[in-house]
């Protein structure tokens, strides 16, 4: 998408992110899943693409040492506003090139955020970067959707929300060959200019992630269909993969 930069998504969506994705997952279940991975208390956690702190803040409230990194200053500002007790340490930067010093007991990237890295090379590099800051025997958790099979192609539009004076649409164009989606959240509010919130993602199949992990010395420890540890099957639309450090 012309003009799109790594920080574009967060900068354009931070003000409505929590509203748009309020029901995307069970926060309590996510936090419980992550909490159980800590080998000690408090554990040391790093969240990649921490966003508004949806998971980082309640995880830190359990007493863990939590650091979150995000390329969007606006996302981190929203996190700071919500983190009234200042429990989460934040880092402004890319989740490949500027990871804070480890070792971390658990590194995690939730809600498809790994796919916000523009291409396979950047996603592969993310695994390599995580391997350098993960404690021996630590966990790297990737939560993401399982790509469509067969891949969905072409344009797609769906209604996200509607009130008497506001409509939010999601429009995207999928390239099944390059495994990319270019899209916009389109906000129409009566009497106001149209707001566009663009996003670009490159999806990866679980087998690709497993290969990148193995190449960096990580191994797949467990894979579930969700954070409640439902069994992962060929029909699962999502996966929660736990990679272990050497």
What is each residue range found by the language model?
Residues 1-51:
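Conserved class I S-adenosyl-L-methionine
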Residues 53-97:
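Class I SAM-dependent methyltransferase SAM/SAH-binding core
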Residues 99-106:
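A short acidic, Gly/Pro-enriched loop at the edge of an enzyme's catalytic core
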Residues 110-112:
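Residues lining the SAM
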Residues 124-136:
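A short glycine-rich, Lys/Arg-flanked "PGG" loop and its adjoining helix->strand segment in the class I
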Residues 141-211:
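SAM-dependent methyltransferase
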Residues 206-246:
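C-terminal lobe and adjacent flexible extensions of AdoMet/dcAdoMet transferase-like proteins
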